[in-house]
Curated annotation (Swiss-Prot):
It comes from Gallus gallus. Ca(2+) 4 binds at residues 119, 121, 123, 125, 130. Residues 1-32, 33-68, 70-105, 106-131 form the EF-hand domain. Disulfide bonds: none annotated. Keywords: Calcium, Metal-binding, Repeat. It comes from the Eukaryota. The keyword Metal-binding applies. Belongs to the calmodulin family. This is Neo-calmodulin.
Length: 131
């Protein structure tokens, strides 16, 4: 799972994530980090100081993130990334759009399945509580 996430960032497949690659992924998620912010993010986990993130460093970062469980605000922000029209629901189309931007080509069945798994009230979309 983490390897898959890592390869979403590592666009050229060379085994490292550069500030450029990090920026590309963040922009595809609707964020707009500055060069300095990207560098800070990399520096936080760049144990060997070579200016890029390799897979072991990525795992360290993920472990840190998971321990420091996402704040309400981070979860809300993530929800907003998916909820393109800001109507309070994530539709199959919105989910597909974000996943495609991340380079994840999903079939309609896979998207519907993801929605079904999260959709507790059965209305065919995902609200904030379900998210």
């Amino acid at each position: 799972e983490f390897k898959e996430a890592f390869s979403l960032f590592d666009k050229d497949g060379d085994g490292t994530i550069t500030t450029k690659e990090l920026g590309t992924v963040m922009r595809s998620l609707g964020q707009n980090p500055t060069e300095a912010e990207l560098q800070d993010m990399i520096n936080e986990v760049d144990a060997d100081g070579n200016g890029t993130i390799d897979f072991p460093e990525f795992l360290t970062m993920m472990a840190r993130k998971m321990k420091d469980t996402d704040s309400e605000e981070e979860i809300r922000e993530a929800f907003r990334v998916f909820d393109k029209d800001s109507n309070g629901y994530i539709s199959a189309a919105e989910l597909r759009h974000v996943m495609t931007n991340l380079g994840e080509k999903l079939t309609d069945e896979e998207v519907d399945e993801m929605i079904r798994e999260a959709d507790i009230d059965g209305d065919g979309q995902v609200n904030y509580e379900e998210f």
